[in-house]
Amino acid sequence: MGLFLLLLLAGPAHAQKSAASAKAAAADSAARPAAKRQLQATRISEAIKIDGDLDEAGWREAPVATNFVETRPTPGRPEKHATEVRLLYDDAALYIGAVMHDVSPDSIFRELTQRDDLGNTDYIGVFLDTYHDKLNGYGFFLTPGGVQLDARYSPAGGEDFNWNAVWESRTQLRGNDWIAEIRIPYSAIRFSDAAEQVWGINFARQRQSTRQQFFWNEVKPQVDGLINQFGELRGLRDIKPPLRLSLTPYVSTYFNHFPYNEQGKRNSSTSFNGGADVKWGINESFTLDATLVPDFGQVQSDNQVLNLSPFEVQYNENRAFFTEGTELFNKGGLFYSRRVGGQPLGFDDLDGRLRKRTTDSDGQIRQGEYVVSNPGITRLLNATKISGRTKNGLGVGLFNALSNDVYATVQDSTTGQRREVLTQPFSNYSIFVLDQSLKNNSYVSLINTNVTRQGSTYDANVTGGLFRFADKSNRYALKGQANYSRRRGQVFGSTEQVDNRDGYKYSLELAKISGNWNWSVNHGIESDTYDPNDLGILFSNNSISQEASVSYNKYEPFWKVNNLRTNIGLYQTLLYKPTRRQDVGFYSSFNTTFTKNFFSLGGNLDGSLVQHDYFEPRRQPLGEYYVRVPANIGLNGYGSSDYRKKFAYDISLAGRWYAADGARTGRNGYDVGLSPRYRATNQLSFRYNFNFSQRHNEIGYAGSLSDQQVADRPFIQNGVADVILGRRRRTTTTNTVSASYTFTNRMSFTVRTRHYVSVAHYRDFSRLNPGGEEETVDYRRNRDNSFNAFNVDAVFSWWFAPGSQITVVWKNANASYLAGDETLPQYFTNFNNTLNTPHNNSVSVKVLYYLDYLTLRPKKRG
């Protein structure tokens, strides 16, 4: 009886253990990459006409890549509507022919968009890992409407659609199928000169009618990485990297109008520019890319904002030269390309440097000179990139750019005499990168950035090393980074020496990277003297940080949703020198997509204990003064409807609530975002973005004090100004309207209008004393301010030949900053003022023409 009971009890326990083991084994298998498929390339001798017909004999002889596997929304499921891809090659190019079967013509979504803009459409994608390092690759995408997209893939840059190549393609719709024919010339990619080669390869298909994505070689979402989940392309023999040499000259003309309406000043002006981009394949691995006398006047206008923080605003890079092929230079986060050709070094402090003061009889102080013009950008003379990767996986990058002197013009208010003041000396910017790819999706990298300026103005140098080591199963990874910064010379515009103390930064992270459950722990230090900001961007140094996080991701559909992603983490930050507490808090997030209507929903919850903000007071050295930020909690939610519908929208709501801080209560803030979009046809679409935010009883730095202001003088003792904080209400409203009409897959027109207004109203003030103590004071200066920015960007683009483009751009711009009694508190008052103040208008035409040596050279006769 006892033995029977023992077996009876042991049976279920053993079954549960076996079930748990089976479940764990299944999870372990799902977290491993799928077995690699192989595709044999077929060499051809006959010419292939890129017309979308696939009627040449070579297509019938080539092996077929088919039986695609779904990645989302249901990973691992075989495709229902077959995809058939064939690959041919000759001495000059790869040829890809693909047939995508579907249920009906109406199921093939084919919105027309601009190049590199994926709309509401199907697509076929071709991925190449030409060095088979499982880290770096190329992507070429084609939609049924013939729109091309291309991208580079790397650990530093992720998926980068800023990269552009010149390749050919055509598509056709036949009954329930659509066909794609693609030619990728060897000049568009880089590979070794080995006699026989094995490349990583994969094909992707997006079926937009069902929001399904498929890959030929299965890509598991729970496995970290994309390139490492490619199949293999074999049979490439005796292909040689061609001479890659191209020249893209440009000419441009600008007409500008601003209503100065002043005697001696013209309201309109014209200018003509010319230059060229040169690309030269130094060998099979490395390419030189240079821009000579570049013209970036047609790039999209920046989204200007009112900045009340102690840190600069980081703007997007819209200049093509600095976004294409820069993945190596972005290693380590030490390169902020807006520094090159950006705002002059002495732009902000010009008034202080030239201040020659005289005293009037009424005791008011006036300035002896005033600024007539102060250019906000630096003229770039040229820029050059050399980059590539050897067959052994060593990536090498070299960047260099030269900018010219920049001068402001000032005028004496008494004599009327003008003079020029240097705001930026002739400067050289350079970056050097080494990046060694290792097995198991790992790498080791070294990067150096340097800024050298003419004359005695200081030079800056930063050197960094970083690594990532993953285990053989690609489940765990250790990564780290160490940087060292150095400055030598004089502060610009003075004889004062730059503080010669060098600085450093390091970080270390251990993480589980594959599977449903993942986690990470990291630690980092930035010394008080670490400063990479001459060619990089760092908002604040002098910190010690620790963080730990756990995430759970469900990749398969369950209940009523397609997937689920969750994350929760804890963090702590300290001031590095002197060691002081800054912040302790938590964060969490989730997002999911519903199965039936493909509505995406997400949210975030975070909170922190009382923070000590050492940067808001703008007082050096750090550590003595700080602004207390009460314990707070923040919550936001966002949603997106199904983009397949003609009408779709995005919506977001966010709020933050603060605990009472002594007598100060009622501090909170909220944000609202709404973005409806309407696709009238496959060629015409509209989008509206509305964002509104308000901060109540926010405590912040009220501004610097000046002995020229009567209200400031009681708070300046012996030349040392107090730190004045203000309790303020800040309201920000942004409206953006855009429309796009695509004539063909090579011709489009877009227009974007943005109006931004932010108003800060101060209610009372306090003096900040050491140790975070605030003392109420009777400060009488009106510190209210408002900022308006209005921009219109209208662009007509026509790719009239491969790599060749005509663009016609109209820009309308206006920005105004009002302070004190001039501040406009109401939105519509600001809007009317923006419309009624002078605007700058610019119309420009730019023509690029792509010249490729391989197409221009005389062809050998048979």
Which residues fall in each region the model found?
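Structural preference for beta-rich elements and adjacent junctions enriched in aromatics
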Residues: 16-435, 445-446, 457, 837-840
